A protein has these predicted regions:
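A membrane-topology feature that recognizes alpha-helical transmembrane segments
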Residues: 1-155
């Protein structure tokens, strides 16, 4: 019984961290390591408290590797083509932490849903900024944080 309460608190803490990370990313464009690390530690704690009922040790390790690894690969490819930093390493760490919670299949779904949420967010930002005719073609200059979209995908 007591373990269920602590597992629930881990879950509530993770939701709070995802909201906090989203706000920070929207305001300053960073996903601080302390929050990503705390998210991962809460995931480990959750699985320990639930006796690995949701994911095995191997599954959450693979989830972290796949989540962080896939996003790191996307980042490297995008950086190569755009000749500048695209996704930040905070986004990579966020998806690695999500993999601890969600496992391999869940983190792939989170990446997909997060990318879709990010696309919708990006379209909204562009529409909100009301791009004028003279600025057409400059859409690539917008910097849209990926963290909030990924947070939505994770949830």
């Amino acid at each position: 019984m007591i373990f269920d309460i602590f597992a629930f608190l881990c879950l509530i803490g993770a939701i709070g961290i995802l909201i906090t990370l989203s706000v920070i990313d929207l305001k300053i464009g960073l996903l601080p390591n302390i929050y990503n690390g705390a998210l991962a530690l809460l995931g480990i704690g959750f699985h320990l408290l639930t006796s690995f009922a949701w994911l095995s040790l191997l599954d959450f390790a693979l989830g972290a590797l796949i989540g962080g690894g896939m996003l790191y690969a996307v980042r490297m490819i995008a950086n190569h083509f755009y000749k500048q930093d695209t996704l930040g390493l905070g986004d990579v760490k966020l998806l690695a932490a999500a993999g601890v919670w969600l496992g391999p299949q869940g983190v792939l779904m989170a990446i997909t849903l997060g990318a879709l949420a990010g696309l919708i967010h990006g379209i909204g930002v562009i529409a909100y900024k009301n791009i004028k005719k003279d600025s057409v073609g400059k859409v690539s200059h917008f910097s849209i944080p990926a963290g909030p979209g990924f947070a939505v995908g994770i949830l």
